């Protein structure tokens, strides 16, 4: 890789003891044993995102290297662990949402034909169905003989895969894109089974045009795809902006009233929306309570965590639970 001559030189690598002394010299309280364990297991760079709010800010809003009084490495570890456990909870919820979307697409697209998902009548004129099918074929090829069902349909049916078989090798991004490509009528039918009903009659002509162009659920599935992939790659959820999802047309739905006005781009908005979907998919689920309690007890009790870093707005109250 060619180096840009104008670029600054990279900082030299440092040892764990050097990193500990650097943190201490900048004003952080550090227990050597705890810090050594975490800096070796997780690395300085990965942890640095979690101590960022503890850095001092000067009068011109410039972030300095030094830490604010009271900065403690133990709090950084607690925040990192809270984020890791939140990823586990999100992954668990997304599994059920992903399977639920697959099943609804199967019911719609394969009602009369196992290969109905290949018929253009279900899709918008601008949707690249051929491109989507090529991408799906690559998923099938990668699964190959290691997937019993794929291997069976390849040998017995000449490589023709009903959607209920194909969907098992697709990821959430694949099925989300397929949903985005559906006609508005098809999108609305599926959305209603998730408890997302848009009253077009209550909208202005321009608003109806916007909703028909892209159903709000498609916007949310796009965001949830990124959230899911962030979890799959062990990325940070706290204090991070995701692709925004419009809230304008869903805030009238019971359970979604407290979403931010206009759009939502932080993890708590995604949590609220997931909770709504999961209450439909699995009535009586304990997932919303578990996530609410985790956020209240493990995030909001830490000194450097502000509610807005999670996307919790002034009209949302999170109470600690057991």
Feature-to-residue mapping (PLM):
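Long, contiguous internal "core" modules enriched in hydrophobic/ aromatic residues
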Residues: 1-322
